[in-house]
């Protein structure tokens, strides 16, 4: 069960992502802030997060560190991702294929009857696959491995260019 504070956080994150979506400009080779949200499987949760994308490094590569929080399935997760992303433009369509991955640090806290237990720190890795449009919209799938690292995350978000 998700607490009221978890619902408030999710609503605020969705509101801010929507606000940024309407004020966003073209997200290309500049650095950007990315707002994302979605669901995960194993554990079954909803999540919201933010990440920073570096300017292009050596052509197609970017470093994308990020943080997100997941709620549900008797568990609260805080994930810290450090991804190396490679981008492949798909012709003149404005769409780009994203692939990458990297290490994940997860902080897990049980809720419900085990709420009194301490937080646990775990490490793992993840692989990212997705698509991004030049206007900033993106969708991605993340496959993870390791203790308490979500096995599959499906999310959408918006990228806002930093000038």
Annotate the PLM regions.
Residues 1-30, 162-163:
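Cleavable N-terminal export/targeting peptides
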Residues 141-148:
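Short, exposed beta-strand-loop hairpins at the edges of beta-sheets
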Residues 149-163:
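Outer-membrane beta-barrel "beta-signal"
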Residues 104-128:
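An anionic, turn-rich surface loop/hairpin at beta-sheet edges
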Residues 31, 44-48, 75-80, 95-97, ...:
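Residues that define the transmembrane beta-barrel architecture of outer-membrane proteins
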Residues 32-36, 62-66, 96-100, 138-140, ...:
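Residue-level detector of the transmembrane beta-barrel scaffold of outer-membrane proteins
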Residues 49-113, 135, 160-163:
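Gram-negative (and chloroplast) outer-membrane scaffold detector with strong preference
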Residues 36-37, 69-71, 112-117, 141:
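Extracellular loop and loop/strand-boundary signature of outer-membrane beta-barrel proteins
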């Amino acid at each position: 069960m998700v607490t009221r504070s978890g619902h408030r956080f999710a609503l605020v994150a969705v509101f801010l992502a929507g606000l940024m979506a309407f004020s966003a400009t073209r997200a290309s080779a500049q650095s950007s802030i990315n707002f994302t949200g979605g669901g995960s499987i194993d554990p079954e949760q909803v999540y919201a997060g933010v990440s920073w994308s570096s300017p292009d490094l050596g052509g197609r590569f970017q470093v994308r560190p990020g943080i997100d929080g997941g709620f549900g399935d008797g568990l609260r997760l805080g994930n810290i991702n450090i991804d190396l992303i490679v981008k492949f433009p798909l012709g003149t369509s404005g769409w780009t294929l994203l692939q990458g991955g990297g290490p994940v640090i997860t902080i897990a806290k049980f809720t419900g009857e085990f709420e009194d237990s301490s937080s646990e720190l775990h490490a793992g890795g993840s692989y990212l696959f997705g698509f991004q449009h030049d206007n900033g919209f993106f969708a991605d799938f993340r496959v993870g491995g390791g203790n308490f690292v979500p096995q599959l995350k499906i999310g959408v978000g918006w990228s806002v260019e930093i000038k």
